[in-house]
């Protein structure tokens, strides 16, 4: 009789363990994500995107989206630790979503309830997004954009003309010897202000030119456009002689304050995004993540 009771007890314990295991679809650093949470998140995504009928492939994609959403959420909550998200921030975030969708304030949560969606899953995602926004906000204080980066961005847009100050070195003949000497000269050209006549006088001439980029013709325009100040071009051939261009300065013309601020904001947001992606990628990389739900 004792042996029979032992077998029943072991069998019962095994079934309880199995039931507990099947109710967990993933774990993040030993923090479980339950099947109920997964179904709630999946239902929420479907409700917010007005999805009703799914093909098998779409259902698989939605499963992946829901489980990864919950994993990212868990990582963010663990990153935040004991820091609480104030209720007014949550309320304002919900109002912002309602405003964007032209909904009356207070109607979004009721809409989810009407769709049989647990609002708690939505609130948790709002909280995780607010944690993410706090991370982005803290990163913004460490991001700086240089004038050089602004100039490069404006130049690459091809929407503004540029005034170029450059030194153009031209060989006195087109011999192989002249080509070799011009290559040696190219390696010695570091700054326009440091150029001395003795560097080139025996085999080349130098002309200082100020011109709008749009007025420079042919291949020279492409070469000059790609050069940064105090950077010499490679040696290139023009009319059976060899030339080098050393750009001294570039001045972008007709850029107003609004255009400049737009570029600064664009570059700042780009840097913040890159830093944030690195942080979120490292979160995943360092975390112990197990997915027990079939992908």
Curated annotation (Swiss-Prot):
<dbReference type="InterPro" id="IPR027304">
    <property type="entry name" value="Trigger_fact/SurA_dom_sf"/>
</dbReference>
<dbReference type="Pfam" id="PF13624">
    <property type="entry name" value="SurA_N_3"/>
</dbReference>
<protein>
    <recommendedName>
        <fullName>Uncharacterized protein RP673</fullName>
    </recommendedName>
</protein>
<keyword id="KW-0732">Signal</keyword>
<dbReference type="InterPro" id="IPR050280">
    <property type="entry name" value="OMP_Chaperone_SurA"/>
</dbReference>
<feature type="signal peptide">
    <location>
        <begin position="1"/>
        <end position="19"/>
    </location>
</feature>
